[in-house]
Amino acid sequence: GEPLQHYYLYLFTGDGQELTLAESAPSLYCFPNRLEDITALEYAVSHGGQYAAYYLGCLLLDRSRWQEAQALWERCAENIALPTVWRNLALIYYNKLHDAPRARKAMQTAFAMDKTDARVFFELDQLDKTTNAPYAERLVRMQENTALLPQRDDLYTEYITLLNLDGQYQKAYDCIMEHTFHPWEGGEGKIPAQYRLALMGLARAADDDTALALLQQALTYPHNLGEGKLIGNLDNDLYEMIGELYAKRGDTARAEEAFRLAARGNFDLTGAIYYNDQPPQMMYYAAKALAALGETDEAQKRFAAFIDYAEAHRDDVMEIEYFAVSLPDFLIFEGDLNKNNRVHCCLMEALGALGLGDNERARQAALRGLAENGCQSELNRIVKGIL
């Protein structure tokens, strides 16, 4: 039966059998949320109820009484084998106590207790991502738990992202094409971005004819991605690369057509916080296309503006306004918005320096950004010389 039903019966009758039934009832869908539930659960806890302590901790955390929740869950961890207790403790250790090693140990314990739990595995990976663990280590763990990956689109997308970061473009593409994705709130555009990156990576290693076909393929999303293009996605990077290939062939008419398509869009440098913000690399490719079209002064002005933005905003104190638009990342573990802004400004500086021909400055800016976020895709590609 429902655990809470038996806890209330125990409170009213004092019948120990009701406490036994409450403690042995399935816990999966028990979510105490009312103030009177606190009384019933506290009574059970005072008489040795271990699962009651777990439920009470969940309710108290929701009421911002996290210190009491921590004490209850740490008591539970000594007495019952429930992975969620350790998972919940990881939230306290990281978000409230700012103790990343302790949080990671708790998440590892939770996953070790049930290695079939794809959600806990994903959350463990997100903790490592948040704390800037090397992406190669995360990829190895993914490859050790491949049966879990297709169970969650967010987890599978993270795996494909790591494959692209590692330069395994063919494997990333194959994984994308053999899975049917379902977009989630805030995750819009994530898997199409990896689809495009995989094809762009394959194009860079191919002969010109094959590269052109791959880039043109990337302009259209297959049905299994589950979504179309976001408003404002102008494929500046793809068209700029296509233009370069046509120019290399000497086909100036098609090159100019591609460069004009690449040069479209507003030049509005922002913090790129939300999923539908214009990525700065797209504005970089638009500026490159302008240069290819002979509009050198405007291109140089835009490249310089990237650097000006970085220098003006790298020390900004960032805040999020939760209204209408979802954030692109899963935020169970609290991120550092100011760190994200510093990394973003490193990318801005690197893009501007690349455009102005200062490759060493671009590389140094990218390395500074990677020191704080080693999984940033564009910074990795700048360091590798393949943006």
Where are these regions (language model features)?
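Short coil turns that delineate tetratricopeptide repeat
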Residues: 1, 46-47, 80-81, 115, ...
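TPR alpha-solenoid repeat register
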Residues: 3-5, 52, 85-86, 120, ...
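"A position-specific structural signal for the A-helix of alpha-solenoid helical repeats
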Residues: 8, 55, 88, 123, ...
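Residue at a conserved register position within TPR or TPR-like alpha-solenoid repeats
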Residues: 13, 60, 93-94, 128, ...
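Structural motif corresponding to the intra-repeat A-B loop/turn of tetratricopeptide repeats
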Residues: 16, 63, 96-97, 131-132, ...
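Flexible helix-coil transition and linker loops at the boundaries of alpha-helical arrays
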Residues: 37-47, 144-149, 181-192, 222-232, ...
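Hydrophobic/aromatic packing residues within the alpha-helices of TPR/SEL1-like helical repeat arrays
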Residues: 41, 73, 107, 142-143, ...
